[in-house]
Amino acid sequence: MDEVKASSLFEKVILPLRDDEYLDGDGLPRCKSCHTLRVYVSDDKTFCARCLCKCQSEQIEKEKELEAIRRNLEEFYDRQRLSLMGDRYKDCRLSTAVITEHNRAAYARAKRYVEYAADMRRENIGLYFYGDNSSGKTYITACICNELLRKGYRCVYTNFARILSEIRSGYSGDGMGELDIMRKLMTCDFAFLDDFGKEFIGREYNRSAAKWAEEKLFEMINARYNSKRPTVFSSNYAMDELASKL
């Protein structure tokens, strides 16, 4: 901006000097910190008005960034609450996971899945982690879920035992209800089913209950597949082992 003698301008307008300002050689107020102008003067030198100096503008941008971070965190916690994830796994992050030779390949796959989440969602690509008890498969799927929630995706993290419990409770008016929970599972961007396959254990002792559970399970999985919504599984069983139990 063309810096001009502004004494005559300031005689005609009320523009008190602030504590953090000083007048430069042209009689224009500048910031004591960044030394940039705090006033705009028109090209024809007939108008002047207050404006932000460099550090004021930077402060406003920082406040906007902090507000965006705060808003994003609030939205993340809302999505996390709606995801049905319990308190035990709500802080799981890929960045803080303990990587060992045993799980390195699995975590590399998990990080790649999160990195290309948009492609995974569009192409309906899920994941299947399996291993023995305490192998870390639940933790890694919880990490993936939290990372996707932070990216803004709608996720549901649960296991089928809980789904069935909610449905049964809904019949007595205490749970979410079958329609609500099935809709939630069928319409979220990514569904996470922990301990997949346990619902088939002991089916020979209660065939009617097992049949009902299987119907609900395959109804949900089939609906997600047809609507191209990925599902991430963790299980104690390899796929061929699981197939033998069906």
State where each predicted segment sits.
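N-terminal pre-Walker A segment at the start of P-loop NTPase domains
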Residues: 94-120
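Conserved alpha-helical scaffold flanking the Walker A/P-loop in AAA+ ATPase domains
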Residues: 114-118, 170-191, 196, 215-223
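Interdomain "pre-motor" coupling segment immediately N-terminal to P-loop NTPase/helicase cores
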Residues: 35-85
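Short metal-coordination and nucleic-acid-contact micro-motifs, chiefly zinc-binding Cys/His arrays
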Residues: 24-30, 47-51, 90
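Short glycine-rich substrate-engagement loop in P-loop NTPases that contacts/grips substrate
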Residues: 104-111, 145-187, 204-207
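Loop/turn-to-beta-strand initiation segments
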Residues: 153-154, 187-190, 227-233
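Walker A/P-loop nucleotide-binding motif
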Residues: 121-141
